[in-house]
């Protein structure tokens, strides 16, 4: 027998400023209400949240709940992030917005590029990128007498430069400092079928320089057998589809770059804060560092909720009937801090025995970049500890502030640090 979900009055999409030791009360309110709760969506109409760990994993594997943006409410078009529909040429190559066999096909293409052994072989290059960025910040801090700011100066630039290095996209450090807005403009243009990447009236940044570098990486992958990620993608896309255009390859690697730096950058900011607050023992070995990273993954998910899913047909989830097209989110942060699965769930304890978390998702859309994010995290910690053993926060830990940017990103506002 099915019924209606309880309605919760709290706003899960609000973006209050919070301290590092405070988690939004919305998650507790959700759990108290039930495993499926109904809320008012910011763009209008109802939406449903899944708050229970086991039910969340069931939902993330349920083929009736899909990521097809065509099923989103019409009023959400142009209002809700991530629901733009790519032009027909590019749509089959959208890993995060296709399901079933189409998704399995794309996963087969992407998985070899993210092979853990292949990634581990690039550890030295990843460490070199981290070391160069941190050294530049330390030198600038020494000249100015002001602390280095690691959110704007490192947390996002580091994973951006790493993923570009792996893809064979020759992005320089100065370009990385402007690349976030450029990448957003590129993604928007690709999904709308827009023109040359510029919009003088709207102030959209010129994307031509970065687009040229992406094309350069694609052309190089076609000509050379150097095993960059782009080359691996090219080979496996050819095998799956028979052919692939330059535009399609550029679209795929643009998606990888954007996903590979934005959320990783958000997480690295939180991870750095925990390390620099002295929570990682000075003599921590590799296993202890790995446990520390895993606890940070649980405690500081860079996204509070999953991407939107929509009911392809009428479904009953947790005893609640959802109509066709029903928008559904899984409460990642809430399940990660559920006392039924974790002792002292709102405390940061690197030695806790259970690493159960939903930060990287579950089911077919489990994050393919998890191994890279973990490698970047461990490598960054190693470089920081070896080159700047006396690095510390420039402000008390309790004064750090973080906020959400809508439903899909949580990030520190700034992270001032003395690099010594």
Swiss-Prot record:
Cofactor dependence: heme
Family statement: Belongs to the cytochrome P450 family.
Catalytic activity, EC: 1.14.13.181
Keywords: Antibiotic biosynthesis, Cytoplasm, Heme, Iron, Metal-binding, Monooxygenase, NADP, Oxidoreductase
Pfam family, one: p450
Keyword match NADP: yes
Keyword Cytoplasm: yes
A single GO molecular function term of this UniProt record: oxidoreductase activity, acting on paired donors, with incorporation or reduction of molecular oxygen, NAD(P)H as one donor, and incorporation of one atom of oxygen
Catalytic function, reaction form: 13-deoxydaunorubicin + NADPH + O2 + H(+) = 13-dihydrodaunorubicin + NADP(+) + H2O; 13-dihydrodaunorubicin + NADPH + O2 + H(+) = daunorubicin + NADP(+) + 2 H2O; 13-deoxycarminomycin + NADPH + O2 + H(+) = 13-dihydrocarminomycin + NADP(+) + H2O; 13-dihydrocarminomycin + NADPH + O2 + H(+) = carminomycin + NADP(+) + 2 H2O
Domain of life: Bacteria
Record-given protein name: Cytochrome P-450 monooxygenase DoxA
Catalytic EC class: oxidoreductase
Functional note: Involved in the biosynthesis of the anthracyclines carminomycin, daunorubicin (daunomycin) and doxorubicin (adriamycin) which are aromatic polyketide antibiotics that exhibit high cytotoxicity and are widely applied in the chemotherapy of a variety of cancers.
Subcellular location as annotated: Cytoplasm
GO CC terms: cytoplasm
InterPro entries named in the record: Cyt_P450, Cyt_P450_B, Cyt_P450_CS, Cyt_P450_sf
Pathway terms, separated by semicolons: Antibiotic biosynthesis; daunorubicin biosynthesis; Antibiotic biosynthesis; carminomycin biosynthesis; Antibiotic biosynthesis; doxorubicin biosynthesis
Principal location: cytoplasm
More info: S.peucetius subsp. caesius ATCC 27952, a mutant strain derived from S.peucetius ATCC 29050, is the only organism reported to produce doxorubicin in vivo.
Assembly behavior: Monomer.
Annotated residues for binding of heme: 367
GO biological process: daunorubicin biosynthetic process; doxorubicin metabolic process
Gene source species: Streptomyces peucetius subsp. caesius
């Amino acid at each position: 027998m099915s019924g209606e979900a309880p309605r919760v009055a709290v706003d899960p999409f609000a973006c209050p400023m919070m301290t590092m030791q405070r988690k939004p009360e919305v998650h507790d309110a959700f759990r108290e209400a039930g495993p499926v709760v109904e809320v008012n969506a910011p763009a209008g109409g109802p939406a449903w949240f899944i708050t229970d760990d086991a039910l969340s994993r069931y939902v993330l594997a349920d083929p009736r709940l899909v990521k097809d943006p065509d099923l989103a409410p019409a009023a959400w078009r142009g209002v809700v992030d991530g629901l733009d529909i790519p032009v027909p040429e590019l749509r089959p190559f959208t890993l995060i917005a296709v399901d079933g066999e189409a998704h399995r096909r794309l996963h087969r293409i992407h998985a070899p590029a993210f092979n853990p052994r292949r990634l581990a072989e690039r550890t030295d290059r990843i460490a070199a990128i981290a070391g160069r960025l941190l050294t530049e910040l330390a030198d600038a801090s020494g000249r100015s007498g002001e602390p280095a700011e690691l959110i704007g100066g490192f947390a996002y630039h580091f994973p951006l430069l790493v993923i570009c290095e792996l893809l064979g996209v020759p992005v320089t450090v100065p370009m990385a400092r402007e690349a976030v807005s450029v990448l957003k403009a590129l993604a928007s243009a690709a999904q709308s079928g827009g023109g040359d990447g510029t919009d003088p009236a709207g102030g959209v940044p010129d994307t031509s320089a970065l687009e040229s570098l992406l094309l350069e990486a694609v052309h190089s992958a076609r000509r050379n057998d150097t095993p960059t990620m782009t080359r691996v993608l090219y080979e496996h896309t050819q095998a799956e589809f028979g052919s692939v255009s330059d535009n399609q390859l550029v679209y795929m690697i643009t998606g990888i770059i954007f996903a590979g730096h934005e959320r990783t950058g958000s997480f690295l900011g939180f991870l750095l804060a925990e390390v620099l607050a002295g929570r990682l023992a000075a003599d921590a070995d590799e296993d202890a560092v790995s446990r520390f990273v895993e606890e940070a993954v649980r405690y500081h998910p860079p996204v509070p909720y999953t991407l939107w899913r929509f009911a392809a047909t009428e479904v009953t989830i947790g005893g609640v009937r959802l109509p066709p097209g029903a928008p559904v989110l899984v409460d990642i942060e809430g399940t990660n801090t559920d006392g039924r699965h974790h002792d002292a769930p709102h405390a940061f304890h690197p030695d806790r025995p259970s690493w159960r978390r939903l930060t990287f998702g579950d089911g077919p859309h489990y994050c393919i970049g998890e191994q890279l994010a973990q490698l970047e995290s461990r490598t960054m910690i190693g470089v920081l500890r070896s080159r700047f053993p006396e690095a510390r926060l420039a402000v008390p830990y309790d004064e750090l502030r973080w906020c959400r940017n809508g439903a899909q990103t949580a990030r520190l506002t700034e992270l001032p640090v003395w690099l010594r």
